[in-house]
Curated annotation (Swiss-Prot):
InterPro entries: 3-IsopropMal_deHydase_ssu, Aconitase/3IPM_dehydase_swvl, AconitaseA/IPMdHydase_ssu_swvl, IPMI_Swivel, LeuD. It comes from Psychromonas ingrahamii (strain DSM 17664 / CCUG 51855 / 37). CDD domains: IPMI_Swivel (cd01577). This is 3-isopropylmalate dehydratase small subunit. SUPFAM superfamilies: LeuD/IlvD-like (SSF52016).
Length: 204
């Protein structure tokens, strides 16, 4: 998993609430278990017209000014609906590494941290201020400093990022569950060797 670093990036505005996982990545694209290749299908039903090929000019993220954005600013209750890890996979594969909302579905929120994606919870007033700044200056860049737990904007907004210390360390170190386990490989091996002596029948 790629380590999360301090960055200053374009903040893309998608002012929609209750965006569920089926809207993030429709079910017809859940046909593989690799984490890559889902970005092209992100928000598919909104991004493309009925022919499934032509970009929808009315969809927010299709604006050229948001090209290359790493920060997604969106409405309340993001990531609700059925549980599917493909949702954060698609968001990360598209190029985002940060999602800002007032609230996230619990399972989606947890899955973000396992996929190098930082979900930032803000108050309704803070979200309104961020959205207003983007609307007034589309293409504006925000700075996210996870180590300092701070989000800043050119307009003077400063927001404290509330994040669990373990999850923060995982993102900064690029450590998913497997990587955390491998950090204790020596202890695991020692335990196994001891168990082979005390409970040999388990290893037959």
């Amino acid at each position: 998993m790629e380590a999360y670093k301090k960055h200053t990036s374009i903040a893309a505005l998608m002012n929609r609430s209750n965006v569920d996982t089926d809207q993030i990545i429709p079910t017809q694209f859940l046909k593989k278990v690799e984490r890559t290749g889902f970005g092209i299908h992100l928000f598919h039903d909104w991004r493309f017209l009925a022919d499934n090929v032509t970009p929808n000019p009315e969809f927010e993220l299709n604006k050229p000014v948001f090209k290359g954005a790493k920060i997604l600013v969106t409405g309340d209750n993001f990531g609700c609906g059925s549980s599917r890890e493909h949702a954060p996979w698609a968001i990360a594969d598209y190029g985002f590494n940060t999602v800002i909302s007032t609230s996230f579905a619990d399972i989606f929120y947890t899955n973000c941290f396992k996929n190098a994606l930082l979900p930032i919870r803000v108050s309704k007033d803070e979200l309104a201020a961020l959205m207003a700044e983007i609307s007034a200056n589309e293409g504006v860049k925000f700075t996210v400093d996870l180590e300092a737990e701070k989000l800043t904007t050119p307009g003077g907004i400063v927001i404290h990022i509330e994040v669990d210390p373990f999850r923060k360390e995982s993102l900064l170190g690029g450590l998913d569950d497997i990587a955390w386990t491998l950090k204790h490989e020596d202890k695991i091996t020692a335990f196994e060797e001891k168990q082979k002596q005390t409970l040999p029948w388990l290893w037959k």
